[in-house]
A protein has these predicted regions:
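Oxyanion/phosphate-interacting regions
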Residues: 110-117, 131-193
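Conserved beta-strand termini and adjacent loop/short-helix elements that scaffold enzyme active sites
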Residues: 8, 100, 126, 171-173
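Acidic beta-strand-loop-alpha-helix segment within the catalytic core
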Residues: 47-133, 183-193
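Conserved acidic residues
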Residues: 22-24, 56, 95, 141
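Conserved beta-strand segments of alpha/beta enzyme cores
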Residues: 4, 121-122, 167
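Flexible, acidic active-site loops/lids enriched in D/E/S/T/G that coordinate Mg2+ and/or position polar
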Residues: 1-51
Length: 193
């Protein structure tokens, strides 16, 4: 069985063709281009298998760091063979917020400023889909992304974070809803992990 591939680096496939796909591969061969150029190691290769509108399999590999996250729907999520999450919120004295190193928006900053917590807030800036994976492994509590991303930027890590017991949700006007894939417009809406 072979499935079609939707990729940042591939040809543009019209929605009229894509809307009939039951399964497809969603691939970003280089997520975190700015981090790659900066040579800081915070870039990833993202591969997801999408069923209708939901990631059911995901692999996020950071080659410079030699770190691999993966998940399969119903079978948990892992980081280098260790089941996620590795830590729980109760094991920390701070509320860790992860944000983009290269793409912080005013809206994201306002969201972070409005977070109400009894713990001291700690901001972690990192590139690529590693932000989502930090929430999956329990190294961060929340990742708000109120700025532009594409479906291939999130699909693989979305599978990982979902199987870790957390979730990636669409965020609009203070309300959360399911984040879907293979939409007519491949630009993601704002989301919070």
């Amino acid at each position: 069985v072979s499935f079609p591939i939707l990729s940042e680096e591939g040809r543009e496939i019209p929605y009229e063709d894509r809307k009939h796909w039951e399964y497809f591969w969603l691939v970003d061969p280089l997520d975190g281009t700015k981090e790659f150029v900066k040579k800081n190691g915070e870039f990833t290769v993202n591969i997801a298998l999408i069923y209708k509108d939901t990631p059911v399999l995901g692999v996020v590999y950071a080659p410079a760091l030699d770190v691999c996250y993966w998940a399969k729907q119903g079978e948990s999520a892992f980081k280098d063979g260790q089941k996620l999450p590795l830590k729980t919120v109760d094991q920390r004295n701070t509320y860790k917020i992860v944000a983009s190193r290269s793409h912080m928006s005013n809206e994201t900053q306002a969201f972070i400023d409005a977070i109400d917590t009894d713990k001291e807030k700690e901001l972690i800036s990192i590139g690529s889909s590693l932000k989502i994976c930090l929430v999956a492994e329990g190294e961060a509590d929340i990742y708000p992304r109120l700025g532009p991303t594409m479906e291939w930027d999130t699909g693989a890590a979305h599978a990982v974070v979902s199987e870790s017991g957390r979730n990636l949700m669409k965020y609009k006007d203070g309300k959360y809803s399911k984040h879907e894939y293979n939409k007519e417009e491949l630009l993601n809406q704002w989301f919070v992990v």
